[in-house]
Design a protein with these regions (language model features):
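Extended Gly/Ser/Thr-rich low-complexity repeat segments
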Residues: 64-82, 158-178, 210-213
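Autoprocessing Asn-cyclization modules and mimics
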Residues: 21-134, 145, 149-151, 181-196, ...
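Proline- and Ser/Thr-rich low-complexity, intrinsically disordered segments
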Residues: 20-21, 538-794
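Bacterial Sec-dependent N-terminal signal peptides
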Residues: 1-23, 622, 637
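Acidic glycine-/aspartate-rich tracts in secreted/extracellular proteins
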Residues: 81-84, 145-147, 155-158, 220-221, ...
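Glycine-centric low-complexity/flexibility signal
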Residues: 87-120, 159-161, 176-178, 185-461, ...
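Repetitive beta-strand solenoid architecture
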Residues: 50, 66, 72, 135, ...
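Short, solvent-exposed secondary-structure boundary/capping segments
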Residues: 54-55, 143-156, 223-228, 432-435
Length: 794
């Protein structure tokens, strides 16, 4: 047997791999911005560990890059987006509703704090159980059935609940992928059931050119939507504390979407509005005109969460007027939204919030809280939480920004270039969302509402075989909070200048890779600001930045290595395979087909039966998303036949051997002649003995009998008996004699004389060289003969 070494065999191997396996979608270049490559569907029935089929809404999945329906060998990503449980006690709201407003109130509380909830607002919405949220796995398709079933080559490793919005993402399997400069690929927008996830597998090289992007920035969970309802200002006492959550829109703005759900789920627990943060979603700004909180993603769960984000240290004096020690504090998660509205110009450097002198809504601490930090878990990945909306009553408020999505890459080759892979949160929407500018001589007034909180950073998850270089940038930053952009005409009615709440910054996201030194950014987003001249010395006006996310190198990767083999006659061979990286527990499994269930062996080696024809086996491991093809090529030795035509070599030209015939084996052939004869079938060489070796594409070979290229001998000169007579002063001329030559049709030529005799006479003193030429034009030359001169007496 012969090892599979030749480059042509590599081409054959790739063709086997590409059939229903990695690289099946070929090479691809992204040339335009915002190209969508994935296609999406949703799980339609709960799925459990060990299942090898899933039920989906549609198994066509022929959108995005794909023009054909899902088929065997395709790759899917299964991920549960939501389904988290959070700390919400609905007792007060349900009693309020059931009693027609006679008891309790239109609000919900943290568990255990029905009566003292104002002291424990940060507990509202904290994550109590993740359930299956964020669980994910790659799976290879074995087949599809009907229009709604996908059969898998490996059983599921996770449970999935459809109540948690499980989506199925079809993943392109590229051989090589190039992202051109200024081009980008993005997912579909998360729409509440699918989207927000960009997933790609590349078997070979990923080239990410300058300004090229693989991005899910702003494609994640949705921000809270503004509604033009509020209680007005002031709605009560200066020290009133707004609700954590309520089902009544006049109490506050809508919360951002989170891993616990969105308005459908929030409505079920009477908690769609107000400042409490639902899991990693930002809280909505409370009335009147407070800013929305920023969404979040993974973050520190050892630091105490207050929902207040990170106050800018530039304004520690102002923060400490709100609460001693607040300046320099750090709450993980998203940033808080800014204070509620004020209409009186006071000194913000000496007068804190919740003071009657501010008028309006007293500039109360009613901004939406930043999203709760998610506990890092290597078995889960999350979308960034949406920002909470700003409270509005003038249709000038800003909605919350979308969270960053998930950028998921499986890379078996190298990555190069200087582009960006990102999943940043989107900025919160400004108060005055359309950027209108009031005409000076008018009553126009724009921007007089609360701004939206930013989206939290999403997740960049890369399983890479080779290290990611430091020329690549990975980014999962939180977005920046929305700004209050006031623009008021000179004839506007009072209040002509008011300060409302900017949005909180989004918390940083999550980056996980296998290895490398890329630039990694998981920064929290900045708070928004206000341009109101009432708080010119404190533009954040109560809004804070989001905290940083987390990066690590915990992403697992593995690959299966195996070499093909060759038999030049029917026989058996032992094939070997190994793994690199961090494969799942369990043995390698040898199959007879790429997607079938027939197992022929387990373990790292397999001895085949006697094979008469070329046969391919497939090695996989479960859980896993591919099988590696291993081919045993069965061939025969090539034959060398024919009577060669041999032309002898001469002193002026090489000889040749031609007209041999090669047959059998597997083309193309390679040739090698002995004695450095060259690597072509037809030989051109000096006289000598030569043997031809022929190797076919499978490495099988044959050698010929020896072939002789004869040589044609040229003339020769024997000068050993040469006699030189001198020229003498008495007139006797010199001569050269005794030279013997061999050859046919010889002619002679001497230097320095016209004499053409082999033994010339009549020579003057001097130096002479003889050249003899035969009938074939071959020559031989003598050494130089010197005829002396003998002078007379002096």
């Amino acid at each position: 047997m012969k090892p599979y070494l030749r480059s042509v065999l590599f081409i054959i191997l790739v063709s086997f791999q590409a059939h229903g396996q990695r690289a099946k979608d070929g090479n691809y270049t992204v040339t335009s911005a915002n190209s969508v490559l994935n296609s999406y569907t949703t799980l339609s029935s709960n799925a459990t560990i060990g299942q090898s089929l899933i039920s989906v809404s549609s198994n066509a999945l022929n959108g995005g890059f794909f023009t054909t329906n899902l088929a065997a060998g395709d790759l899917i990503l299964i991920i549960q987006m939501q389904g988290t449980s959070m700390n919400v006690d609905t007792y007060a709201a349900s009693e309020y509703i059931n009693s027609n407003g006679q008891f309790w109130g239109p609000y919900t509380t943290p568990f255990g704090h029905q009566n003292d909830w104002p002291l424990f607002i940060p507990l509202w919405g904290e994550i109590t159980a993740y359930n299956q949220t964020g669980k994910f796995e790659l799976a290879q398709v074995r087949s599809v059935s009907g229009t709604a079933t996908i059969n898998l080559t490996c059983p599921l490793t996770n449970n999935y609940a459809i109540s948690g919005r499980v989506q199925i993402v079809r993943v392109p399997r590229f051989a090589n992928l190039t992202i051109n400069s200024n081009a980008s690929t993005v997912p579909s927008l998360w729409n509440g059931t699918s989207g927000g996830v960009l997933a790609i597998e590349v078997d070979g090289n990923l080239i990410l050119n300058a300004n090229g992007k693989i991005s899910s920035s702003g494609y994640g969970f949705r921000g809270g939507v503004t509604e033009n309802q509020t209680l007005g200002a002031p709605s009560g006492s200066v020290n009133d504390v707004g609700f954590c959550a309520s089902h009544v829109a006049t109490q506050g703005a809508e919360k951002g979407e989170s891993i616990a759900g969105f308005y459908t789920e929030y409505d079920l627990v009477y908690s769609r509005y107000c400042k409490g943060a639902p899991a990693n979603g930002g809280g909505g700004g409370n009335n009147h005109n407070a800013g929305g909180g920023g969404g979040s993603n993974v973050g520190s769960t050892t630091l105490t969460y207050t929902g207040k984000g990170i106050p800018s240290i530039t304004y520690n004096t102002n923060w400490n007027l709100e609460l001693a020690g607040m300046g320099g504090s750090n709450s993980p998660g998203g940033g808080r939204g800014g204070y509620s509205g004020s209409t009186s110009d006071q000194n913000e450097n000496t007068l804190g919030p919740n003071q009657m002198a501010w008028a309006g809504d007293y500039r109360r601490k009613e901004g939406g809280l930043g999203g709760h930090p998610i506990q890092q878990d290597n078995t889960r990945i999350f979308v960034g939480g949406g920002g909470g909306a700003g409270d509005q009553n003038n249709s000038q408020g800003g909605g919350g920004g979308r969270g960053g999505g998930i950028t998921f890459l499986k890379l078996y080759g190298s990555i190069s270039g200087s582009g960006t892979i990102e999943a940043n949160g989107a900025n919160g929407i400004n108060a005055n969302p359309n950027g209108q500018i009031a005409v000076q001589a008018s009553t126009q007034k724009y921007g007089n509402d609360g701004a939206g909180g930013a989206g939290g950073g999403g997740s960049v998850y890369i399983s890479n075989t080779n290290p990611i270089p430091n020329t690549i940038t990975l980014s999962a930053n939180g977005g920046n909070g929305g700004n209050q952009q006031l623009s008021v005409g000179l004839l506007a009615t009072s209040p002509t200048n008011e300060a409302d709440g900017p949005g909180g910054g989004g918390g940083g996201g999550y980056i996980s890779i296998s290895s490398g030194t890329p630039i990694q950014q998981v920064n929290g987003g900045n708070s928004g600001t206000t341009n109101s001249t009432q708080v010119i010395n404190f533009p954040p006006n109560g809004a804070t930045a989001g905290s940083a996310g987390i990066t690590n190198t915990n992403t697992n990767f593995f690959d299966i290595l195996a070499a093909n083999d060759t038999l030049c006659a029917a026989g058996s061979v032992t094939l070997n395979a190994s793994t690199i990286g961090n494969p799942p527990a369990g043995n390698l499994i040898w199959y007879t087909s790429a997607f079938g269930t027939t197992v022929v062996a387990t373990g790292n080696s397999y001895t085949t039966p006697v094979l008469n024809t070329t046969t391919t086996y497939y090695i996989g491991i479960c859980p896993g998303s591919f099988r590696r093809p291993v081919t045993v090529f069965v061939g025969g030795n090539p034959s060398i036949t024919g009577t060669p035509t041999i032309v002898g070599a001469t002193c002026t030209s090489s000889g040749t051997i031609t007209n041999l015939t090669i047959s059998g084996g597997t083309q193309p052939y390679s040739y090698s002649w002995s004695n450095n004869g060259g690597n072509s079938l037809n030989l051109v060489a000096p006289a000598g003995t030569y043997i031809l070796s022929v190797q076919d594409a499978l490495g099988c070979s044959s050698t010929s009998i020896p072939y002789i290229i004869p040589g044609i001998t040229g003339p020769s000169l024997n000068v050993s008996s040469a006699l030189i007579n001198p020229q003498i002063c008495n007139g006797t001329m010199g001569s050269i004699s005794g030279i013997v030559s061999t050859g046919t049709n010889l002619s002679y030529s001497w230097t320095n004389t016209a004499n053409n005799s082999i033994n010339p006479s009549g020579l003057s003193a001097g130096s002479y060289v003889l050249t003899v030429t035969d009938g074939n034009g071959c020559t031989a030359s003598s050494p130089s003969f010197v005829v002396p001169y003998v002078a007379g007496p002096m």
